[in-house]
């Protein structure tokens, strides 16, 4: 099973970043470089170290830094596959996505995958100041339009894509980079709900399963929706990639495990409070917990939220294991359905811990 992990730029755990920003803005700290530690030199070092540790891919998420730039550095100094997981698509034009995908495919010599997602309405409207409507239909057109643009560049001929939301019918030599010597990169979608997942299986090259998930959710909700989409499009499973993003709590010592579990509990509490993920919480019998977390979030009681994530909830939505057992635990859940897994460790962790976690995958 292929295994990738997050390419970090600066302080990546939510709790630590929130505390660091609060200290900076309150005047209790005066050096963002020390508090948040953004460094592109770190990206280069990580890429080399993670490849040596046994990972075959790294991914970025669209959060506090650009989602594409770190991958250009990682690809240029390693043989790792690189992917966005995910780039937020709705605020962007398909032409923007196509250019970024083309260039990263070129820089990586054919090792890039474009992962895109819709995000949720408040983020699109209030953070990106972009319109939100018909997310499933828009994402379908974004995939088809991006593929049409890349195909136009690859094979020549006119660009002819006309949809309800996007229209691309003009491409002159000044805008076209020409054929990519490494071919057209795959386009994957991060999806959660049944309509988005079914659409993904109809038109995209693969599905990025949301990290806030569970084995039951994947088997009872995700896979049937994938099968429905593949069937509607007349596609077979071999033409489609399923990537499981898995939240992992791991550590070689009890102290490391305590740090890991604290970070995972904070992340699960954040996800669990969000109305978007209510169907998942309901499926796992956690509706009351979801409602409580949502109330705490609205009251600004963020420090209290993680205390509501007990061991049972943690082990439902994340994998908790010592490094040498991580691969075995993930394989038991998703080994028969996932083409790749991406490990998500939402807490401070050195490359040596990542290497220890990757060992089991290399052995398998």
PLM-predicted stretches and their roles:
Residues 94-103, 251-262:
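Catalytic cores of alpha/beta
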């Amino acid at each position: 099973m292929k295994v990738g992990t997050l390419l970090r730029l600066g302080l990546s755990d939510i709790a630590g970043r929130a505390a660091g920003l609060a200290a900076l803005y309150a005047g209790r700290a005066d050096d963002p470089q020390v508090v948040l530690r953004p460094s592109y030199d770190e990206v280069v070092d990580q890429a080399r170290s993670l490849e040596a540790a046994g990972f075959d891919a790294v991914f970025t998420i669209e959060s506090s830094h650009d989602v594409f730039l770190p991958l250009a550095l990682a690809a240029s100094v390693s043989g790792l596959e690189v992917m966005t997981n995910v780039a937020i698509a709705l605020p962007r034009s398909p032409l923007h996505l196509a250019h970024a995908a083309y260039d990263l495919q070129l820089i990586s010599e054919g090792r890039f995958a474009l992962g895109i997602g819709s995000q949720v309405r408040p983020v699109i409207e209030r953070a990106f100041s972009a319109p939100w409507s018909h997310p499933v239909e828009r994402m379908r057109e974004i995939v088809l339009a991006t593929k049409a643009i890349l195909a136009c560049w690859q094979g020549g001929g006119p660009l002819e894509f006309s949809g309800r939301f996007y229209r691309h019918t003009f491409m002159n030599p000044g805008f076209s980079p020409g054929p990519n010597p490494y071919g057209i990169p795959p386009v994957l979608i991060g999806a959660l709900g049944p309509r988005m997942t079914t659409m993904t299986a109809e038109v995209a090259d693969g599905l990025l399963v949301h990290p806030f998930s569970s084995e039951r959710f994947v088997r009872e909700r995700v896979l049937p929706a994938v099968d429905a989409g593949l069937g509607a499009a007349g596609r077979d499973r071999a033409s489609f990639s399923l990537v499981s993003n898995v939240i992992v709590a791991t550590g070689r010592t009890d102290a490391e495990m305590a740090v890991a579990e604290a970070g995972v509990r904070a992340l699960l509490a954040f996800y669990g409070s969000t109305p978007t993920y209510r169907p998942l919480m309901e499926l796992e019998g956690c509706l009351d917990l979801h409602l409580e977390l949502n109330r705490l979030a609205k009251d600004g009681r963020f420090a209290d939220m993680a205390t509501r994530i007990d061991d049972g909830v943690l082990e439902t939505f994340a994998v908790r294991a010592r490094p040498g057992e991580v691969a075995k635990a993930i394989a038991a859940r998703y080994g028969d359905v996932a083409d790749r897994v991406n490990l998500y460790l939402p807490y401070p962790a050195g490359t040596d811990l990542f290497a220890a976690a990757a060992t089991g995958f290399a052995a398998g």
